[in-house]
């Protein structure tokens, strides 16, 4: 007998309040700009932020010299990415010189039992305010990782002249009844005008602070999360790879990669419209099953991976070539015939409800991507772009399938989620008229994140406001 499957959504938004003692800490505040559809953060007036800015971002030594994050703008930090399966893991980081990169991994914190894995280095020329990076380093480790196990790792830019990094930890989780974290549009640098490229750059500093706070709360809410899903626009600067453009983009990546959680939990991203024209995205991440280059723009391509009984597929929706996207989807689905659930992530919210995009480019892209979701029986599609939360009804061939009590049993069609803003760098107002396909929508002008629980029988999605 075929098992029944349920798709369950718990609440459109559940408020999370963080307290230092017994009193709530209000981290975010917003003010409307001259753009009638857009709201930007006013975090620079919040005391928690000013303390962090003075003691971390603009930290000074005894001689008054800047030594903090805003001085280094370190976009070389290592990022973990999911491997092809739960037994695999990807690593990516920048270095000042090109060498032969490697990662060593063991179960003992002193790495006395470590195995060494060599990778590849690609020559680049990426500068921010402080550094010029000459290599993008990637290492892929396959078949090593067991469930519910803590591993320790260190990495070097060059095994021939090794200077190993400090030891970091990575704890695997179970692959049945597992949980992920979903975020949308961190868009570091978007809280005002384009980045100014100094230690006092309000936009990058503010968005880094808020992005880190959201991830910290997400980890508290979902301590057993296996990895993070980010639905695009990790950074803000949308220009091409001009010298100035690369400078600003790498400074924004310094903010995006700042949270320590990204050294401990794999991150699966998709390419947003703000990343699509530059090449830095493909240098910062080591995405699995991307070697065919299907769905490519300058920034990178489609890719996929499996975790437990779920197939995850990331499509580059900046590329409108449905032939290539179909080829990737076909390869992914045929390679994972036992997947109980199929989840696609791309940036543009084809069933969103934000004022700027849902009835313009979102509607146009719907004609391209929605038929692919129907064709391959995709259960859930995760998107961003409109900086407001939206959940569709189950959609099949453009028709909204109603369901009661936020639970669908043996559902037909695809559920579409627009993730909102994880950093609160900016928000878009909701469309004046609620579209026919929208089951729930929200713009509380507070950053959001979601947890997604997967089992053989169900997917449960909970979305939180973080204040």
Predicted segments — roles?
Residues 1-10:
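Bacterial Sec-dependent N-terminal signal peptides
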Residues 182-184, 227-233, 267-273, 316, ...:
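Active-site neighborhood of phospho(di)ester-bond hydrolases with catalytic His/Asp-centered motifs
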Residues 175-198, 325-363, 421-423:
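Mobile, glycine- and charge-enriched loop segments
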Residues 147-174, 195, 199-201, 242-338, ...:
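Extended active-site neighborhood of metal-dependent phosphoesterases/phosphodiesterases
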Residues 11, 22-199, 445, 455-467:
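Acidic, histidine-bearing metal-coordination/catalytic regions of metal-dependent phosphoesterases
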Residues 186-190, 234-238, 273-277, 312, ...:
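Solvent-exposed loop/turn segments at secondary-structure junctions
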Residues 198-203, 210, 238-249, 339-381:
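Active-site-proximal segments of metal-dependent phosphoesterases and phosphodiesterases across multiple
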Residues 178-270, 275:
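Conserved, compact domain cores that house catalytic/ligand-binding motifs in diverse enzymes
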């Amino acid at each position: 007998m075929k098992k029944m499957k349920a798709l369950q959504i718990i609440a459109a938004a559940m408020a999370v309040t963080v307290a230092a003692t017994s009193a709530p800490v209000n981290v975010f505040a917003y003010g409307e700009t001259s753009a009638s559809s857009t709201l930007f953060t006013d975090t620079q007036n919040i005391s928690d932020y000013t303390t962090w800015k003075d003691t971390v971002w603009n930290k000074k030594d005894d001689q008054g010299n800047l030594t903090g994050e805003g001085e280094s703008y370190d976009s070389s930090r290592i990022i973990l990415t999911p491997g092809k399966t739960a037994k695999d893991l990807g690593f990516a980081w920048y270095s000042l010189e090109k060498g032969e990169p490697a990662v060593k991994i063991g179960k003992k914190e002193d790495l006395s039992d470590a195995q060494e894995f060599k990778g590849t280095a690609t020559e680049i020329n990426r500068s921010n305010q402080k550094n010029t990076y000459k290599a993008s380093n990637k290492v892929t480790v396959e078949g090593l990782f067991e469930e519910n196990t803590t591993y320790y790792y260190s990495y070097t830019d060059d095994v021939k002249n090794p200077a190993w990094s400090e030891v970091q930890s990575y704890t695997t989780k179970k692959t049945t009844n597992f949980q992920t974290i979903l975020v949308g549009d961190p868009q570091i640098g978007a809280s005002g005008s384009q980045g100014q490229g100094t230690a006092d750059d309000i936009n990058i500093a503010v968005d880094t602070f808020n992005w880190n706070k959201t991830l910290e709360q997400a980890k508290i809410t979902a301590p057993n999360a296996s990895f993070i899903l980010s639905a695009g626009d990790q950074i803000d600067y949308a220009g091409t790879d001009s010298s100035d453009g690369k400078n600003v983009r790498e400074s924004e990546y310094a903010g995006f990669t700042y949270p320590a959680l990204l050294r401990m939990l794999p991150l699966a991203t998709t390419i947003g419209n703000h990343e699509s024209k530059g090449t830095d995205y493909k240098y910062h991440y080591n995405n699995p099953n991307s070697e065919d280059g299907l769905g490519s723009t300058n920034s990178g391509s489609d890719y996929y991976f499996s975790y437990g009984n779920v197939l995850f597929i990331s499509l580059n929706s900046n590329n409108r070539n449905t032939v290539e996207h179909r080829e990737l989807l076909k390869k992914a689905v045929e390679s994972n015939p036992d997947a109980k659930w199929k989840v696609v992530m791309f940036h543009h919210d084809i069933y969103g409800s934000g004022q700027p995009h849902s009835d313009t480019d979102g509607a146009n892209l719907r004609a391209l991507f929605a038929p692919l979701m129907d064709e391959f029986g995709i259960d859930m599609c995760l998107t961003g772009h409109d900086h407001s939360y939206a959940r569709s009804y189950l959609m099949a061939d453009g028709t909204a399938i109603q369901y009661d009590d936020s639970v669908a049993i043996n559902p037909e069609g695809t559920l579409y989620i627009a993730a909102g803003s994880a950093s609160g760098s900016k928000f878009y107002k909701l469309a004046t008229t609620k579209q026919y396909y929208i089951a729930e929508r929200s713009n509380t002008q507070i950053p959001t994140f979601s947890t997604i629980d997967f089992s053989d029988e169900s997917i449960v999605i909970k979305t939180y406001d973080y204040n």
